[in-house]
């Protein structure tokens, strides 16, 4: 695998920002899957490659990894600050095409993240479903309005969202409503959360909402907390599921059993 760490100038952010990219050193890069990996609130773009098997998995699946940096922005166009959502969902693919020749064909493009990054990944997929074949969220901040006071210790939520109120375009439960009439494509989802994670109940509620809409999704849960041990395991499962098995089924997994529902 080739590994690149670069700083690019972003018009959306009004500043230079870091991006990590890994690319297979064999095979046809034009046909390689592209996986965006989004970091969590207390981490940065290095976490995925420092603490998980991400690069090994990318090699196994012949995939390109793109890992951006977003600070503590919740992947949002901030009320008082940079436009991080515009950067991730619109500008970053253009920058990767310009500098690396990466062509993110929707049928082979995936976005995944943990915690805050899981929220960001799903927000991207729900907002622009035509851009992604699949999406994965691990221990995601599913109910962002309820979690903000606990997560934002310096009250940065006031800078991200006006008056600390999450608007519909930034709320996952509001975003999925547009899919109810069946006219929007539903990217395949892989959702995972540890049973001891404080975000587990909210992830169950999101899972139930999506299942009621017959969303093509995989749900994985196992004993585990909000940590890299669980996310490393979940990443391997998600990449195998999404990159190898793009079927027409909704699959529900537990640590011990799996059932497949047409």
Stretches found by the model and what they are:
Residues 1-262:
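Non-catalytic cap/lid and distal C-terminal segments of serine-dependent acyl enzymes
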């Amino acid at each position: 695998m080739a590994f690149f760490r670069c700083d690019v100038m972003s018009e959306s952010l009004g500043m230079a920002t870091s991006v990590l990219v890994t690319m297979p050193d064999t095979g046809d890069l034009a046909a390689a899957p592209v996986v965006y990996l989004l970091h969590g609130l207390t981490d940065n773009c290095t976490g995925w490659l420092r603490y998980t098997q991400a690069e090994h998995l990318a090699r196994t699946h012949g995939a390109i990894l793109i890992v951006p940096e977003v600070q503590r922005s919740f992947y949002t166009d901030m009320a008082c600050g940079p436009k991080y959502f515009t950067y991730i969902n619109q500008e970053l693919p253009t920058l990767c095409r310009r500098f690396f020749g990466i062509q993110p064909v929707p049928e082979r493009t995936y976005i995944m993240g943990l915690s805050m990054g899981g929220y960001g990944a799903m927000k991207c997929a729900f907002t622009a479903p035509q851009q992604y074949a699949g999406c994965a969220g691990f221990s995601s901040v599913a109910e962002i309005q309820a979690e903000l006071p606990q997560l934002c210790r310096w009250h940065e939520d006031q800078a991200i969202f006006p008056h600390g109120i999450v608007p519909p375009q930034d709320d996952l439960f509001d975003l999925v409503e547009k899919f109810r009439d069946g006219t929007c494509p539903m990217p395949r989802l892989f959702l995972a959360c540890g049973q001891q994670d404080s975000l587990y109940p909210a992830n169950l509620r999101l899972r139930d909402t999506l299942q009621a809409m017959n969303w093509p999704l995989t749900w994985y849960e196992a004993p585990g907390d909000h940590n890299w041990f669980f996310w490393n395991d979940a990443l391997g499962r998600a990449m195998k599921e999404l990159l190898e098995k793009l079927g027409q089924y909704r699959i529900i997994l537990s640590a011990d059993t799996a059932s497949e529902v047409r």
